[in-house]
């Protein structure tokens, strides 16, 4: 599972997730991708479950890129604890994802296989997603 090796602060503020993602909106490494249509926190367990679903369907063919990383800790207090007496203990790690961000990329498989693998992965995630393809730059080649 994805977790940071070292962090400066164990407990973080929750923060706001307004607007669209600043970067990572296009498919860059692979040929096909899975793009988030709304903003949400995605846990390291959800990322791992989606990765396993994709690789199982592709049967060890192709390559998968995970474009998000869970660098933000979230905390929780024990059940039955009264208000006050400080912030809770770190519970897990999340990747804050804004709408428009490409979450996963795939290459080395056909479009049908990629579409189905990413559909299976999307069922493991708490965000609405859509299948996207890499946009080719320029229509004609300038060679020779």
Swiss-Prot record:
A GO CC annotation given for this chain: cytosolic large ribosomal subunit
Keywords in alphabetical order: Ribonucleoprotein, Ribosomal protein, RNA-binding, rRNA-binding, tRNA-binding
rRNA-binding in keyword set: yes
Gene3D superfamilies on file: Ribosomal protein L10e/L16
InterPro entries xrefs: Ribosomal_uL16, Ribosomal_uL16_bact-type, Ribosomal_uL16_CS, Ribosomal_uL16_dom, Ribosomal_uL16_sf
GO annotation (BP), single: translation
Presence of keyword Translocase: no
Annotated function: Binds 23S rRNA and is also seen to make contacts with the A and possibly P site tRNAs.
Protein name: Large ribosomal subunit protein uL16
Organism: Ligilactobacillus salivarius (strain UCC118) (Lactobacillus salivarius)
């Amino acid at each position: 599972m994805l977790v940071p090796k070292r962090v400066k602060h164990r407990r973080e503020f929750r923060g706001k997730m307004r607007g669209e993602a600043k970067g990572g909106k296009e498919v860059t490494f692979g040929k096909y991708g899975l793009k988030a249509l709304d903003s949400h926190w995605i846990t390291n367990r959800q990322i791992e479950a989606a990765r396993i679903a994709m690789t199982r369907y592709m049967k060890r063919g192709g390559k998968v890129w995970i474009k998000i990383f869970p660098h933000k800790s979230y905390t929780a207090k024990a059940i039955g604890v009264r208000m006050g007496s400080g912030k809770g203990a770190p519970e897990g790690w999340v990747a804050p994802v804004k709408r428009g961000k490409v979450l996963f990329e795939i290459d080395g498989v056909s479009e049908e296989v990629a579409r189905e693998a990413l559909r299976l992965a999307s069922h493991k995630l708490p965000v609405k997603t859509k299948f996207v393809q890499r946009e080719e730059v320029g229509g004609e080649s300038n060679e020779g």
